[in-house]
Amino acid sequence: MGALAAAIAIGLAALGAGLGNGMIVSKTVEGIARQPELRGALQGTMFIGVALVEAIPIIAAVIAFMVM
């Protein structure tokens, strides 16, 4: 039962991260299309946001392995 809970936790975290990353990148591309001169600032902010979003599935995977 613990393996199933771990799989569900990792799967849901990955799903949420995928959706979050997609939204972050799409809004960044939209912003760059509107104001190309802000490309560097927008990309820097995007990378920080993606890193924060990706931290959640990593933490979920660690917790899931601890539950198993």
Curated annotation (Swiss-Prot):
It comes from the Bacteria. The chain crosses the membrane at residues 5-25, 47-67. One of its GO terms (cellular component) is plasma membrane. Keywords: ATP synthesis, Cell membrane, CF(0), Hydrogen ion transport, Ion transport, Lipid-binding, Membrane, Transmembrane, Transmembrane helix, Transport. InterPro entries: ATP_synth_csu_bac/chlpt (IPR005953), ATP_synth_F0_csu (IPR000454), ATP_synth_F0_csu_DDCD_BS (IPR020537), ATP_synth_F0_csu_sf (IPR038662), ATPase_proteolipid_c-like_dom (IPR002379), F/V-ATP_Csub_sf (IPR035921). It is a multi-pass membrane protein. HAMAP family: ATP_synth_c_bact (MF_01396). This is ATP synthase subunit c. It comes from Oceanobacillus iheyensis (strain DSM 14371 / CIP 107618 / JCM 11309 / KCTC 3954 / HTE831).
